[in-house]
Design a protein with these regions (language model features):
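A conserved active-site-flanking secondary-structure segment within enzyme catalytic domains
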Residues: 115-125
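Short, thiol/selenol-centered motifs that function as redox-active sites or metal-ligating centers
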Residues: 102-103
Length: 125
């Protein structure tokens, strides 16, 4: 079965993270939320508390096909600063698997250099 993981950090944009989870699950794709904050409860940019399905450090990434980064501030900054996530994204990119990011989060990929030679749009557009 196809698997997608949506990475959550304090300050993520709730609609960008949770709408993706909803749509992918409706499409029959096994989708999990993964906290990079060291705790399951994550507070979104608008104060909504979300319980992640798993913690980054306890998650098996061997079969995941798509990594999704929602935007929001300071969530995007937390995503940029997480070294384990950076290593995972770079490996995923080398393996030509799917990477997705919304709003400000494409800057995470841009900072890693994986958007060179590719068209991408991010906030501010």
């Amino acid at each position: 079965m196809k698997k997608a993981y949506v990475f959550l950090a304090d300050g993520f944009e709730e609609i960008e993270g949770l709408t993706v989870v909803d749509l992918l699950r409706r499409a029959g794709i096994e989708t999990r939320t993964v906290s990079i904050m060291g705790q399951e409860e994550i507070q979104g940019a608008h104060g909504i508390i979300v319980k992640a399905d798993s913690l980054f450090e306890n998650t098996d990434f061997s079969e995941v096909k798509m990594l999704v980064l929602p935007g929001g501030m300071p969530g995007t900054i937390h995503l940029k600063e997480h070294k384990g996530l950076e290593e995972l994204i770079l490996k995923h990119n080398e393996e030509k698997k799917y990477l997705a990011a919304i709003c400000a989060a494409p800057t995470v990929f841009g900072g890693m250099g994986i958007l060179k030679g590719k068209k991408a749009i991010c906030y501010p557009g």
